[in-house]
């Protein structure tokens, strides 16, 4: 591979600082009464986590929703209808505008009613800081919905806002409650504050990635006068059953353990200044990488965490790992070229310059044979990032992914990562992230080559382990670890078949692996859309749906090894229809997870026959992705599937022409057998076309 030296033109270098900051600005304060002149200084406000999953009423009003159950604080305070399920008016602009006008009228009438009926003189003091605000109906809201980083193993520490002890429950059983307003509530006027929260990544003090939201905080209405008798509170009935049901569902929701992985770097560095020396051209590439590539790297991991795991993982390495930096800049140039549709020599030079610099750095580092962790990071980046960017028509020279993976295997062995995760006597507190990523590439990459995974023995031991079976694959890419281990076993069986295993032994192994796949379905229950009752994404249910899709794809892959297999078999067609039904439960579109199921679409689509519902469903999902569907592994898989279908239909057309009819119904058994024996296999198409893809 030859290209110009990175120093072929004069570099104008400068220090690039990558910084992630969060700022909060109070934009508006509303009070029911004028504050006193001798007001105390406001105390520091408590930040709220950003939420994209509030009720549709708050979304329409563009207000912060605390996701209270059964009603959020804002809707309860204003007497509005709180809807967590998508309402009919949401999908129509006119209906949405009408609904917004109705909400305004309701709020206006409520304010006028409060003003006319407000005859009680209340104390006029300066409102305290938010840290002294009273609990609202958010007492019943789910803290897990707002903080997905709660530990998966933690049984304690959940914030229920107003914890009660056993001796306190008697207060709720009294039929009447005598309230002293001065005792229960501090004597201040109710108020509302809108807070604008911004989260930015700065490079050279220039904002690149920016997230902004406006949140509203409201206190209770004015407390009743002393001596007021409140009506008894019904503790039984439909409302309390609904609250209990929703809380039980949210509390049993399994959340991602943020400390599950060992990222081999300090995540705290992601929030501090990261100094990088770059010239002006490379600075633009880095900006593009941070803005457009970084958020798409690990969508399943991000959905579990509701945070910025990719930033915590990647940004520190950019400053400390020169090979990794060149790799990311090359990927950024490749992504910029494909998304912007640019075809010129300058962008190609940027791609090849940084690609060459990465390979040069890796060769020098491997020759030194020291400090293996940064080398492993950069090598895995060369492999995995290609699954996110680029297009099938890319013609620039590159090293095949499986040659890079040979270096990965050597580095994993030197770091003894496979031994660390397999040692049952000393279980690790944190799974090495690079071992999890390596396993993902190893297992599905083996199916690309028709060979055994290089760490198949490790996966076999993990599968048989009772207490130490997880490698973190479910957390990283969505599929349960044991199902991935079985895909590894199927790849091993295919390798043995290619080496000449007899048909009887092959069928025995196929039956045994089929039973093992069935064992992973025990207690799975019915699959549903991955959303909670309040409309938030359920990571646990999403994982179940993704696992079910991989499980069906694994069955199809296993059945394809049976001698005499062909796609038009009723059993195969039935599996493809089941797979289509499961894929309908995966969120679609640019913000969905279809691109995380590239391998599943490949296996299922490659055996779908003309007229199958899978093909129409697949084309619909591609259309929903838009131009994004043409990039990365998903784009390459789409081109491969369409080529497989084209060649398969050509075989059918040739068979019809030979039979002298437009239908296969009158074909002789010999002609039908000939068509079945020559159905197009996706790996053969890749070999014919010279495609060396890693489709994960």
UniProtKB/Swiss-Prot annotation:
PROSITE patterns: ZN2_CY6_FUNGAL_1 (PS00463), ZN2_CY6_FUNGAL_2 (PS50048). One of its GO terms (molecular function) is DNA-binding transcription factor activity, RNA polymerase II-specific. Pfam families: Fungal_trans_2, Zn_clus. CDD domains: GAL4 (cd00067). It comes from the Eukaryota. Residues 118-140 have a biased composition (Polar residues). One of its GO terms (cellular component) is nucleus. This is Transcriptional regulatory protein pro1. It comes from Neurospora crassa (strain ATCC 24698 / 74-OR23-1A / CBS 708.71 / DSM 1257 / FGSC 987). The gene is adv-1.
């Amino acid at each position: 591979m030859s290209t110009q030296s990175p120093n072929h033109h004069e570099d104008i270098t400068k220090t690039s600082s990558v910084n992630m900051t969060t700022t909060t600005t109070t934009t508006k304060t509303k009070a029911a009464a004028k504050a006193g002149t001798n007001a105390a200084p406001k105390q520091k406000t408590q930040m709220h986590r950003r939420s994209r999953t509030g009720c549709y009423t708050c979304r329409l009003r563009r207000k912060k929703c605390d996701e209270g159950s059964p009603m959020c604080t804002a809707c309860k305070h204003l007497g509005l209808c709180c809807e967590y399920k998508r309402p009919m008016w949401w999908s129509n602009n006119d209906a949405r505008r009408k609904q917004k006008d109705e909400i305004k009228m309701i709020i206006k009438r409520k304010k006028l009613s409060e003003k006319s009926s407000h005859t009680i003189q209340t104390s006029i003091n300066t409102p305290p800081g938010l840290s002294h605000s009273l609990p609202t109906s958010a007492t019943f809201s789910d803290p897990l919905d707002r903080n997905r980083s709660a530990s998966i193993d933690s049984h304690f520490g959940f914030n229920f806002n107003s914890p009660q002890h056993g001796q306190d429950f008697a207060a709720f059983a009294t039929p009447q409650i005598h309230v002293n307003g001065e005792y229960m509530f501090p004597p201040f006027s109710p108020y509302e504050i809108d807070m604008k929260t911004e989260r930015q990544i700065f490079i050279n003090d220039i904002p690149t990635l920016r997230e902004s939201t406006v949140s509203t905080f409201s206190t209770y209405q004015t407390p009743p006068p002393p001596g007021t008798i409140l009506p008894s509170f019904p503790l039984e009935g439909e409302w309390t059953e609904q609250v209990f049901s929703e809380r039980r569902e949210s509390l049993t929701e399994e959340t991602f353990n943020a400390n599950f992985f060992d990222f081999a770097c300090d995540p705290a560095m992601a929030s501090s200044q990261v100094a990088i020396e770059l010239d002006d051209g490379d600075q633009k590439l880095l900006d593009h990488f941070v803005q457009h590539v970084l958020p798409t790297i690990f969508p399943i991991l991000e959905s579990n965490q509701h945070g910025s795991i990719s930033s915590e993982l990647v940004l520190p390495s950019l400053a400390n790992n020169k090979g990794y930096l060149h790799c990311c800049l090359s990927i950024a140039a490749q992504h910029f070229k494909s998304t912007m549709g640019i075809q010129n020599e300058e962008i190609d030079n940027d791609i090849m310059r940084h690609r060459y610099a990465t390979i040069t750095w890796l060769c020098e580092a491997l020759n030194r044979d020291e400090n293996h962790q940064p080398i492993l990071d950069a090598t895995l980046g060369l492999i995995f990032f290609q699954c996110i960017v680029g297009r099938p028509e890319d013609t620039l020279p590159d090293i095949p992914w499986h040659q890079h993976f040979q270096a990965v295997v050597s580095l994993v062995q030197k770091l003894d990562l496979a031994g660390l995760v397999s040692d049952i006597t000393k279980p690790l507190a944190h799974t090495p992230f690079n071992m999890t990523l390596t396993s993902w590439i190893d297992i599905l990459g083996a199916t690309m080559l028709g060979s055994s995974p290089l760490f198949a023995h490790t996966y076999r031991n993990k599968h048989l382990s009772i207490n130490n079976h997880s490698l973190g694959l479910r957390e990283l890419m969505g599929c349960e670890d044991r199902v991935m281990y079985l895909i590894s076993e199927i790849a091993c069986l295919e390798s043995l078949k290619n080496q000449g295993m007899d048909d009887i032994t092959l069928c025995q192994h196929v039956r045994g692996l089929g039973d093992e796949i069935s064992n992973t379905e025990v207690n799975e229950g019915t699959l549903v859309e991955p959303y909670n009752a309040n409309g938030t994404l359920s990571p646990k249910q999403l994982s179940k749906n993704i696992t079910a899709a991989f499980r069906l794809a694994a069955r199809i892959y296993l059945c394809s090894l049976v001698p005499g297999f062909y796609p038009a078999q009723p059993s195969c067609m039935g599996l493809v229809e089941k797979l289509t039904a499961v894929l309908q439960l995966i969120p679609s579109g640019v913000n969905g997870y279809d691109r995380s199921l590239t391998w599943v679409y490949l296996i299922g689509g490659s055996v779908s026959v003309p007229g199958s519902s899978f093909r129409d469903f697949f084309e619909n999902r591609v259309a929903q992705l838009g131009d994004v569907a043409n990039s990365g592994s998903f784009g390459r898989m789409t081109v491969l599937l369409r080529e497989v279908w084209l060649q398969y239909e050509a075989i059918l057309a040739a068979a019809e022409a030979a039979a002298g009819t437009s239908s296969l119904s009158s074909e002789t058994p010999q002609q039908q057998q000939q068509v079945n024996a020559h159905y197009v296999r996706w790996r053969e198409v890749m070999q014919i076309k010279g495609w060396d893809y890693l489709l994960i």
